[in-house]
Regions:
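Nucleic-acid-interacting cores, centered on viral/eukaryotic replication and modification enzymes
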Residues: 1-186
């Protein structure tokens, strides 16, 4: 039974990451988001698992993982926003912050688009989500801002060749290029 539930989570998280255009290394956020939303949605009897556990309906705004949202950044980040720039900044929705015991106090997790700019290109890039109380999201116009770059990297018909810097600092092309010698000596 538990293996089936784990598989259900995997089967829900994989397409969520793909749809959002976010790399698999952000699976921890996707798993938490999937489990939260799954528990907040009603089941056969019309009640949600959240309602059964907490005795009341979940008041969270249910937002797709990786969807475009607007939010006011944390006070430290808000100080660097230009004076006449909009206070709400575009970002990507990463989920819900839960306290120990699964209690939700109204905090959402989001990352600024500017902080995610290279997340699909650089596997070492760290992200620092903002824990915020208010998110602006339009369910009639769902957008996934990271999707385009994800598709460019993962679904190119002619992906760029693998390169490494040569002895002179210039890139060298590796692979089956014209003039490559067969490793067997022929």
């Amino acid at each position: 039974v538990i293996e089936r539930e784990i598989r259900r989570v995997y089967d829900g998280v994989r397409p969520a990451l793909e749809q959002a255009g976010l790399p698999p290394r952000l699976w921890t956020y996707a798993v938490r988001h999937y489990c939260f939303v799954r528990n907040a949605l009603p089941v056969e009897d019309g009640r949600s698992p959240w309602e059964a556990r907490h005795g009341k309906k979940c008041k969270a705004q249910l937002i797709p993982f990786g969807a475009l949202v607007h939010f006011k950044p944390s006070p430290a980040r808000a100080r660097i926003i230009p004076k006449f720039a909009p206070r709400a900044q575009p970002g990507v929705f990463l989920g819900y912050h839960l306290n120990p015991g699964g209690e939700w106090k109204g905090d959402y997790l989001c990352a600024l688009l500017s902080d995610l700019r290279g997340v699909n290109d650089d596997p070492k890039q760290r992200i620092f989500p903002h824990r915020i109380k208010e998110v602006v999201f339009d369910p009639k116009q769902i957008e996934y801002p990271m999707r385009k770059r994800y598709e460019e990297i993962n679904y190119q018909e002619n992906p760029p060749p693998l390169t490494l810097a040569g002895a002179n600092g210039q890139p060298e092309v590796l692979g089956n290029e014209q003039g490559d010698q067969d490793p067997g000596g022929e």
